[in-house]
């Protein structure tokens, strides 16, 4: 049956529709209040669809649907199918299968606390999800310090009295129920306290512990009272770090979102008893072109579908398309009413704004990390081309002059693929007469690496602090703006100094554009579309820019200095003449009329300049 024929058979009932590609793979799952209307919209208005939807439809070869009695049932089925199949074109909680949880096996005789990535219907209590495994392990460590419950999988009833205390008992992270160091009743009490702590019920827990401490003291169990006192202090120290963020004592999850072109970051603050008990951020993919409300709705469905706990109130900052339906679904899962609130003023509005700012920061950090990784991958690609493992520090050199005048050299530094401008260096060429780029390059390289040798000796003697050195850090790779002649000039200097560093010339084509790299072993052809090529071009451009800027500065100073020798020419007129003519040669060729046209110049000053260069 064709898609067109199937469209005619769609019922006017709620349900779920399932899009499939030519291999029969599920690529999209959606729900509808009226299946007939929703599914037809896709195929009858293709040109009006978002680009992402157009791409998805180009792969659809078939669809199926499942009728439900209510829209709520459709929502529940949609959540289950998305979780099961993770369709390519659905908005998905990125890598949600990997989010870790803390598991407390309250279904066991002697419960354990452990790390897990799976929620199972086994009667255990689950806390999370957390955004990182490190956060879970650190939290478990903290809980065990205050409530020393076991992590092992021993059969306590069977092993009782047959085993010795493990290391965790001796360092205070386990109460050793396996050796009867603690009776079952007291052990279960510890577990209950740990669960309250993880639930965010810390004020209630402290009150309960204070009552237990008082009772222990009254019964002259002073050692027990002291242990409980230490527990209370530990819990209070963790509670001090929590910010009071809410009015009242309700349980709230506060949700907001920040987005870039290709990904959306959802930040969730978990408020328990009016205090911030934790926060996590998650990423949603396939969100291009979607409204914020759609994305947050998708997050809520996927996040709470398998969540071990649902709060009384969810606060967010955007109207959700399915707000009432989501509230009904969440209420059914929780067992009593769940409110979805979109505040416009007051304390709750301040809270959700704060969550948005945190989402924005998390997204910025993620983008920054991705850029760092991307840069490192480009450096790795370039390093492999020149036979290195990883060229962390690349130095590039260029020479700039005008027919041998105002001769300068530049050194630019790239660390991990990024320019490090604080380590750029300038060189006035002191010992080369006329225009000789090879000799100029030799001078620059020799001075740079002699400085390095001197500074290293001073550092070894303790006469120079390492962070005060300007040249001591050596490059992993050297680039020069030029061909094989420049490369050989540099290699000769390095060889004479006993230094071995790979050197490559950045050669240009006939149109003065970067072409590739050259060394004594020959030229390396690098695809112009590669990221390594773009990095080389960036380094070459930066070395050239830095050299020519320094050259122009030096030229300008010399130019102005010579003009200042002329009667009637001061700083302002010298600058104006430099801006107008750019070189002494042009001024020498200029007529009095040409000179008079320059801003600030008059007949007398123009005549003085004209005569000065014709003495």
Swiss-Prot record:
Domain UVR: residue ranges: 203-238
Subcellular location: Cytoplasm
Single GO MF annotation: DNA binding
Role noted for this protein: The UvrABC repair system catalyzes the recognition and processing of DNA lesions. UvrC both incises the 5' and 3' sides of the lesion. The N-terminal half is responsible for the 3' incision and the C-terminal half is responsible for the 5' incision.
Name of a matching Pfam family: UvrC_RNaseH
SMART domains per record: GIYc (SM00465), HhH1 (SM00278)
Cysteine-cysteine disulfides: none
The keyword Cytoplasm is annotated on this UniProt entry: yes
Keywords: Cytoplasm, DNA damage, DNA excision, DNA repair, Excision nuclease, SOS response
Ranges for domain GIY-YIG: 12-91
Keyword field contains Methyltransferase: no
The species this protein was found in: Thermoanaerobacter pseudethanolicus (strain ATCC 33223 / 39E)
PROSITE patterns on file: GIY_YIG, UVR, UVRC
Biological processes annotated in GO: nucleotide-excision repair; SOS response
Similarity annotation: Belongs to the UvrC family.
Subunit structure: Interacts with UvrB in an incision complex.
Gene: uvrC
Name this polypeptide is given: UvrABC system protein C
Superkingdom, taxonomy of origin: Bacteria
Entry GO CC: cytoplasm; excinuclease repair complex
